[in-house]
Amino acid sequence: MKMKKLTGIVLAAACMVSLAGCGSSEKKEVNVEKPEDLKTLTIGVQQGTTGDILSSDQVEKDSQMKRYPKGSTAIQALKNGKIDCVVIDSEPAAKFGEKNQDLKIIDGVFETEEYAMCVKKGNTELLDEMNKALEELKEDGTVDKIIGNYIGDDTGKYQYESPADVDHSKVTLVMATNAEFEPYEYHEGDGIVGIDVDLSRAICDKMGYDLEILDMEFDSILPSIAAGKADFGAAGMTVDAERQKNADFTDTYANASQVVIVRK
């Protein structure tokens, strides 16, 4: 009799665990059409990015914000049901979408933003040099070709290479970036590649500098430039009023927007 009772208790406990497991695996339907719809959601972002800033303005309490060092870590948390959605830039989102067919991208929630590179506040000499080079690269079509090599129908058709007669007689410029933001900067093999990498190299070629890339956390880029550890930053960085307090920005070179990623 005691054995039967014990068996019954064990079976009942197993059923309860099973039901609890089933309950936790149920998908929560998330619909987002405007920023205000994020108010009660648990949101994953890459720390310090525009997605972090915009989402933080919408939630009821900061504990709803789950900040990760990499966008890919936020995506994994979403797939595991730890968060309701991820807010991130549109192009990296597209890359994540290609690799994760169980996710859905919702666009049109936020307004379009502009990307630029940044230099130490007050370093007008370098800023003017970079803007001049960037203008020339826009005029001769190099910027469009570099972006097209990573986004759109011409992907892989134009890989930027430094001209054979390029003069790198000036000092090396150090570029601060966060190589977790495909297609703008990401790891491939033993190197770092992407739109910002190719464009920075093209700008340095125009100015007569060699290029060194320093990979770091996204929210360390501006402090590193301010401290003189890097000369400029390029990391799919949106120009906004808060960042302009701490750095000067070049002319813009790309447009993007924040999107919301949810489970299907």
Put a short name on every predicted segment:
Residues Q46-T50, K70-G71, V86-A94, D140, ...:
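Beta->alpha turn/N-cap motifs
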Residues V17-G21:
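C-terminal motif of bacterial Sec signal peptides marking the signal peptidase cleavage site
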Residues K27-P69, S90-P92, T177-P183, I192-D205, ...:
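Bilobed "Venus flytrap"/periplasmic-binding protein-like clamshell domains
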Residues E26-D37, N100-E111, K121, R201, ...:
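Acidic, polar ligand-binding/catalytic clefts
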Residues G23-S24, T49, A116-G156, D198-K206, ...:
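Extended ligand-binding regions for polar small-molecule ligands
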Residues Q58, Q64-R67, Q76, C85, ...:
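Extracytoplasmic small-molecule ligand-binding "clamshell" domains
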Residues I53-M65, I105-V109, L134-K170:
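Ligand-binding clefts/hinges and TM-proximal coupling segments of bilobed small-molecule sensing domains
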Residues S90, A94-N131, D154, Y158-S162, ...:
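Periplasmic-binding protein-like
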